[in-house]
């Protein structure tokens, strides 16, 4: 047995004896490193005569290739073994009884709880829940809501756009849940025209929305809820009553003072922002008392252009709509300081702020439970 064969046998034995990736790396350095045994053999080729190099070169290079391949195979084997061992170690027997601990019982996320609370309150007022796609067309997200091409209000939304499809139709992640209002009005208008059923629209629309914004009080994905009423006699007084009843029920106070400030939204006219009376002197906001005011939502009468584009004659029908951020009012009601924690999947956070699975939405007296 010559020196190369003896060296190869020794290296292969060392490779086989390695029990982890650190051991494999040590063998690689000893054999193929800058001062490794195989590397030293390769260096001797430079001092050989052409005849000797022609004889020894293929043998030494072949040794290097076989060692490299053996190292790779052994490393793969060890990685597979490590994964198998980890799977065996972390295997869960699903037939075992659940251990009675806070973590094992799980918690309802505050966003899910607040959505349940909101929809339950409006359901008691006779509203139904409507939903729509997260991916919308430019038409439904902007144009049908009275955002004309080039309107500066479009620039107010830092929007996630998709590349145009084969129909050259620009799509995007919706920046608000308002497109569902248009879809619903179109559906009811078609039903009225085809079947003669002129039904009142009363819907509440919870869902995810998307904008390029991220800080302690903003997230690129956030939750929003909107409401819409369309009828021949809908008016601002109706809207104010609905919102007052909602605020009392949601914040669980017997009365609430509201003030409406003129504002601007392309899809409503007139448009107002709603503040409610509160006390912000302590660590948590208290509603229904104090001398402070806090903005809660935006609302207004549905713009005639929106009604018209959705199949309703604004000379006959009127509507009102409102919208609010679910994440924000959840933070206000339950005292959560940082919006980003909603999406961190921290078990400690969800144990503190989460709700038991059997909790029912908290409804104020006067609404059914």
Curated annotation (Swiss-Prot):
EC code: 6.1.1.20
Positions contributing to Mg(2+) binding: 269
Keywords of the record: Aminoacyl-tRNA synthetase, ATP-binding, Cytoplasm, Ligase, Magnesium, Metal-binding, Nucleotide-binding, Protein biosynthesis
TM region positions: none
Coiled-coil stretches: none
Gene Ontology cellular component annotations, sorted alphabetically: cytoplasm
Keyword Acetylation among record annotations: no
Cofactor details (free text): Binds 2 magnesium ions per tetramer.
Keyword Mitochondrion: no
One of the record's GO molecular function terms: tRNA binding
One protein family per Pfam: tRNA-synt_2d
Cellular localization per UniProt: Cytoplasm
Highest taxon of the lineage: Bacteria
Leading EC class: ligase
Gene Ontology terms: biological process: phenylalanyl-tRNA aminoacylation
Co-factor requirement: Mg(2+)
Record field: catalytic activity: tRNA(Phe) + L-phenylalanine + ATP = L-phenylalanyl-tRNA(Phe) + AMP + diphosphate + H(+)
Subunit structure: Tetramer of two alpha and two beta subunits.
Alphabetized NCBIfam families for the sequence: pheS
Family classification: Belongs to the class-II aminoacyl-tRNA synthetase family. Phe-tRNA synthetase alpha subunit type 1 subfamily.
Name of the protein this chain belongs to: Phenylalanine--tRNA ligase alpha subunit
Organism: Brucella canis (strain ATCC 23365 / NCTC 10854 / RM-666)
Lineage: Bacteria, Pseudomonadati, Pseudomonadota, Alphaproteobacteria, Hyphomicrobiales
């Amino acid at each position: 047995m010559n020196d190369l064969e003896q060296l190869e046998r020794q290296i292969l034995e060392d490779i086989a004896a390695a029990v982890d990736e650190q051991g494999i790396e040590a063998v690689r350095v000893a054999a193929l490193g800058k001062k490794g045994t195989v590397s030293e053999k390769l260096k001797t080729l430079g001092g050989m005569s052409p005849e000797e190099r022609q004889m020894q070169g293929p043998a030494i290079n072949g040794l290097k290739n076989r060692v490299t391949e053996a190292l790779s195979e052994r490393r793969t084997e060890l990685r597979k073994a490590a994964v198998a061992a980890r799977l065996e170690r972390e295997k869960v027997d699903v037939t075992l009884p659940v251990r009675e601990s806070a973590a094992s019982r799980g918690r309802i996320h505050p966003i899910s709880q607040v959505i349940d609370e909101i929809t339950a309150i409006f359901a008691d007022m006779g509203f139904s829940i409507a939903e729509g796609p997260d991916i919308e067309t430019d038409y439904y997200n902007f144009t049908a809501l009275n955002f004309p091409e080039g309107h500066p209000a479009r620039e107010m939304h830092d929007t996630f756009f998709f590349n145009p499809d084969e129909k050259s139709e620009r799509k995007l992640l919706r920046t608000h849940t308002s497109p569902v209002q248009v879809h619903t009005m179109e559906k009811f208008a078609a039903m009225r025209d085809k079947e003669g059923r002129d039904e009142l629209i009363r819907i509440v629309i919870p869902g995810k929305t998307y904008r390029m914004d991220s800080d302690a009080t903003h997230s690129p994905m956030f939750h929003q809820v909107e409401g819409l009423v369309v009828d021949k006699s809908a008016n601002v007084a109706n809207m104010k009553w609905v919102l007052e009843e909602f605020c009392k029920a949601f914040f669980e106070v017997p009365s609430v003072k509201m003030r409406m400030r003129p504002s601007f939204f392309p899809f409503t006219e007139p448009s107002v922002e709603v503040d409610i009376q509160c006390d912000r002197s302590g660590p948590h906001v208290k509603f229904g008392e104090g001398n402070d005011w806090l903005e809660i939502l935006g609302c207004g009468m549905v713009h005639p252009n929106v009604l018209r584009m959705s199949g309703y004659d604004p000379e006959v029908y009127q509507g009102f709509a409102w919208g609010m951020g679910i994440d924000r009012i959840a933070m206000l009601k339950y005292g959560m300081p940082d919006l980003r924690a909603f999406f961190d999947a921290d078990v400690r956070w969800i144990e503190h702020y989460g709700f038991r699975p059997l909790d029912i939405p908290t409804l104020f007296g006067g609404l059914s439970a």
